[in-house]
UniProtKB/Swiss-Prot annotation:
Binding site for substrate: 291-294
Additional observations: Present with 2840 molecules/cell in log phase SD medium.
A molecular function GO annotation: ATP binding
Post-translational modification: Phosphorylated by the cyclin-CDKs PCL1-PHO85 and PCL2-PHO85. Phosphorylation is a prerequisite to ubiquitination. The phosphorylation level depends on sterol composition and may also be involved in subcellular location.
Provenance organism: Saccharomyces cerevisiae (strain ATCC 204508 / S288c) (Baker's yeast)
Protein name per the record: Sphingoid long chain base kinase 4
Cross-link annotation Glycyl lysine isopeptide (Lys-Gly) (interchain with G-Cter in ubiquitin), location: 148
Phenotypic effect of disruption: Completely abolishes the conversion of phytosphingosin to glycerophospholipid.
Reaction it catalyzes: (4R)-hydroxysphinganine + ATP = (4R)-hydroxysphinganine 1-phosphate + ADP + H(+); a sphingoid base + ATP = a sphingoid 1-phosphate + ADP + H(+); sphinganine + ATP = sphinganine 1-phosphate + ADP + H(+)
PANTHER family assigned to the protein according to its UniProt record, in alphabetical order: ACYLGLYCEROL KINASE, MITOCHONDRIAL, SPHINGOSINE KINASE
Length: 624
């Protein structure tokens, strides 16, 4: 096959534009269906983990996907990797292109050695991009004639193949849909290289880097390439599927994007605390918890107990690959409950600092206070979370059943509550939210930014606001950041307010948190912000009739429950709660805590994590 029949492409500001001279995407009946090209373009540029549905916009099982449609743009946010192909190497039949150079290679299969208890995975390839959602299509061709070459191969512009001086033969790895997941695929392209200066025509100095490096730079613009990741897996967590979910769905994306991976499996309760406390932080820049929310809690507290905790929190980003029964961190930070899409967001996001909360109780305050990244709760929610552990195999539905049961019983949990307010009324809270919602915005933008001459579906600009540049410096934290402003050993400060005893003696729900979602479809804190220096507080009492409580609970998926007049919703800096019951518990990040006075305060910007677009998932609170 001659070179002119190979897929040819042009590097543009939006991505790699397919400009094959003689090939189009036909179905088996020889026709390019109306809407196919636009549908694929849309699905390549979006970032949701749902499936695309539109009139004529999805592919039937009979359709051939060996070729991309003419004028398809593979956006930079879809590209995972790129490398030069040496056309003289084995696989090109001594300089002749393979019989079908257009086929894509399915890279989602796991290694046969995946059941090793502790192993290291590394990939030398340079990485490239991020992504979002695709049409419902399972039968991407898994046969391949793609050339297997090492990443350091240089291009061979062989005259016999008709490759011109301004063209490079490049193997592109990018993310494509398969069912409900995203998987890496490879495609070999003959790319016409046009310099930045020539394309932009801005007069700026021309950078003489190669085409591959330019693709990588634009695909990972403002994000970290080649991450060194410690993946911690609880193989028995949730429904017991965490290991398989990571190996089959998340790992292929991480490996093909050039990440170096080591895997550690937890072997006993709270093992992740010990792993984080003892690990060599010089080997990693990211800890990815392939689990529910319990492992991130343990990792954060393990790092907190290190003698070099300042260095640990300055260097390491802690994130989640959703593989457990509760995946609030991934839903809030990566905007998805799907491990493959979360992995894609992981490699594309910029490190962002978020607030933590420090919890103190008499039984452990002289040992180590506990850090919390998600929430603390007392009352119905705590009982429903912890006391349904025996049916954890049911997944998130266990929590809903527990809440409904306790509400119907009309349980109340008397206590005393002292609060340091930041925004007491709902009106003050809304003002605070609007003033602070973009305070920490400064990370990679995945969403399209339309220009007058481009279709909004095809664009994926990676803009950054420099307001957080200093905040993300390597030495942002020092030991002072870990000192408590309100030690529990001291009396309650005078500027704290004691909540009305008529409310607290009839308390049903006491819930404080820092992330908008506490579980899938449970948007409990819609006004939560990553680093606004406050904790969200939600309270209800047992005097609310069941006829009113029912619609409140049914609106948790929308987050509109906080608008109901019976629901107290505030922003606070610290609080102390003193239970008046003899039996019960607290739940902190889903972990059982003793029933004794609990004091909590905000710890501003203590932890690095990875946020898609530099912010939490949009809860639409602004428009509520």
């Amino acid at each position: 096959m001659v070179v002119q029949k190979k897929l040819r492409a042009i590097l543009t500001d939006e991505g790699v534009l397919i400009k094959s001279q003689s090939h189009h995407m036909f179905n088996k009946h020889g026709q390019l269906r109306s809407g196919d090209s636009l549908s694929l373009l849309s699905c390549l540029s979006c970032l949701d983990d749902g499936t695309l549905s539109s009139d004529g916009g999805s592919f039937d099982e009979d359709d051939s996907l060996e070729l991309l449609p003419l004028n398809t743009t593979i956006p930079f946010n879809r590209i995972l990797n790129a490398k030069y192909v040496n056309v003289g190497q084995k696989g090109f039949n001594n300089g002749k292109i393979s019989s079908n150079p257009f086929q894509t290679e399915n890279l989602s299969s796991s290694s046969e050695n995946d059941d090793v208890e502790n192993h290291s995975l590394s990939n030398d390839k340079a990485p490239v991009s991020e992504s979002q959602s695709f049409p419902k299509k399972d039968k991407w061709d898994t046969k391949t004639n793609t050339v297997k070459v090492s990443p350091d191969d240089s291009q061979d512009n062989s005259p016999s193949l008709g490759i011109k001086d301004n063209q490079q033969l490049i193997e592109l790895t990018f993310a494509v849909p398969k069912g409900h997941d995203v998987i890496p695929q490879k495609l070999t392209l003959l790319i016409d290289h046009v310099s930045r200066k020539s394309r932009a025509n801005t007069g700026e100095e021309n950078i003489s880097s190669g085409t591959v490096e330019e693709i990588l730079e634009k695909s990972y613009e403002n994000s970290k390439r080649n991450r060194s990741i410690l993946v911690i897996i609880n193989p028995h967590g949730g429904k017991g599927t965490a290991k398989n979910l990571f190996l089959t769905k998340a790992r292929p994306i991480l490996v093909e994007s050039g990440c170096k991976i080591e895997i550690a499996y937890t072997k006993y309760a709270r093992h992740a605390i010990d792993i984080a406390k003892d690990l060599d932080i010089s080997k990693y820049d990211t800890i990815a918890c392939a689990s529910g929310d319990g492992i991130p809690y343990e990792v954060i507290n393990g790092l907190y107990r290190r003698p070099d905790r300042v260095d640990a929190f300055n260097k390491l980003a802690v994130t989640q690959l959703p593989c457990g029964s509760g995946n609030a961190m991934s839903i809030s930070c990566h905007w998805t409950n799907n491990p493959s899409y979360a992995a894609l967001c992981l490699v594309k996001s910029i490190e962002t600092r978020i607030d933590l909360m420090c919890c103190s109780q008499p039984s452990y305050m002289n040992e180590w206070p506990r850090l919390s990244f998600l929430s603390q709760t007392y009352g119905v929610i705590a009982e429903s979370d912890i006391n349904t552990e025996f049916i954890r195999w049911m997944g998130p539905v266990r929590f809903n059943l527990g809440v409904a049961f306790n509400i119907i019983q009309g349980k109340k949990y008397p206590c005393e509550v002292f609060v340091k307010y930041a925004a007491k009324s709902k009106k003050e809270l809304k003002v605070h939210f609007l003033e602070n919602k973009d305070k920490n915005k400064g990370c990679l933008t995945f969403e399209p930014n339309p220009s007058p001459n481009s279709s909004p579906d095809l664009l994926s600009k990676n803009n950054i606001n420099n307001s957080t540049k200093d905040e993300l410096s390597p030495n942002f934290l020092n030991e002072d950041n870990f000192k408590l402003k309100y030690p529990m050993t001291e009396p309650v400060p005078r500027d704290w307010e004691k909540m009305d005893s008529e409310l607290t003696d009839n308390l049903t729900i006491f819930y404080t948190g820092k992330m908008p979602y506490i579980a899938k479809d449970t948007k409990f804190f819609p006004a939560a912000l990553p680093a606004d220096g406050t904790i969200d507080l939600v309270i209800t009492d047992a005097r609310i009739p069941v006829t009113r409580m029912t619609p409140i609970l049914l609106s948790l998926d929308k987050g509109s429950h906080v608008l109901e007049p019976e629901v107290i919703h505030s922003k606070i800096l610290a609080y102390k709660i003193i239970p008046k019951v003899e039996s019960g518990l607290f739940s902190v990040d889903g972990e059982k805590f003793p029933l004794e006075p609990l004091q909590v305060e905000i710890m501003p910007m203590l932890c690095k994590t990875l946020l898609r677009n530099g912010r939490y998932i949009d809860t639409e609170f602004e428009s509520m």
